[in-house]
């Protein structure tokens, strides 16, 4: 089995005097034989000499076979294989910037995440204030049941975890209750006295009459 055959490369220190190539698959030759045709074949305005690659030699031979009066030349190959020019080397790279639509979409997604996190926190606060849990009562006395708390954010809730933006304080005949948006009722036993039920039960239940006293005899013995 034969290994991969790598073609042999020929190199020139100064490079081809026409295209500036420094390596070629063919040998470099002296340009003296072709220098007289450089001006017409490659459109040069100066004299060039030195090594010339086989590709440029073939272009000179092709130019010689052109019909008389032809103005065709291969000026485009002059210095075509030279190293990168100073202009190309110093050309700044374009910095990719985010388009307006992409920036706007990133801002919207960020706001949506903040909104979802805020709603999650509010939901957890409301769940902690649910009547199903055992509330932690404050040490407020019964004497303060008829005192209305200040409105707005300055009023202090009865429960430390009570969210007054959800629970609305209402005063009824039996005391103070807190009513939610969906009809839930939160009661503090320190501020609630079931007077209504007691009065109703007392009105429905007839008064029990005691046993009649025995008549006292006035007869003298």
UniProtKB/Swiss-Prot annotation:
Q: Where in the cell is it found?
A: Nucleus
Q: Which InterPro entries match?
A: FAM60A
Q: Which family does it belong to?
A: Belongs to the SINHCAF family.
Q: Which UniProt keywords apply?
A: Nucleus
Spell out where the chain crosses the membrane.
none
Tell me a GO biological process for this protein: positive regulation of stem cell population maintenance
State the name under which the record lists this protein: SIN3-HDAC complex-associated factor
């Amino acid at each position: 089995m034969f290994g991969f055959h790598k073609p042999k490369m020929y190199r020139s220190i100064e490079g081809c005097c026409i295209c500036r190539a420094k390596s070629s698959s063919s040998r470099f030759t002296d340009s003296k034989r072709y220098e007289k045709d450089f001006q017409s074949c490659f459109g040069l305005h100066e004299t060039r000499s030195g090594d010339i690659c086989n590709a440029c030699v073939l272009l000179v031979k092709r130019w010689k076979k052109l019909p008389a009066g032809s103005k065709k030349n291969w000026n485009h190959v002059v210095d075509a294989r030279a190293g990168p020019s100073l202009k190309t080397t110093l050309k700044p790279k374009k910095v990719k910037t985010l388009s307006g639509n992409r920036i706007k979409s990133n801002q919207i997604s960020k706001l949506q995440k903040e909104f979802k996190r805020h709603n999650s926190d509010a939901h957890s606060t409301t769940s902690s204030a649910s009547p199903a849990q055992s509330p932690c009562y404050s040490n407020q006395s019964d004497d303060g049941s008829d005192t209305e708390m200040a409105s707005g954010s300055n009023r202090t809730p009865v429960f430390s975890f009570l969210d007054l933006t959800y629970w609305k304080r209402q005063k009824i005949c039996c005391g103070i209750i807190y009513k939610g948006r969906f009809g839930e009722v939160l009661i503090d036993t320190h501020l609630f006295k079931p007077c209504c039920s007691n009065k109703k039960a007392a009105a429905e239940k007839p008064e029990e009459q005691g046993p009649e006293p025995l008549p006292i005899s006035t007869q003298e013995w």
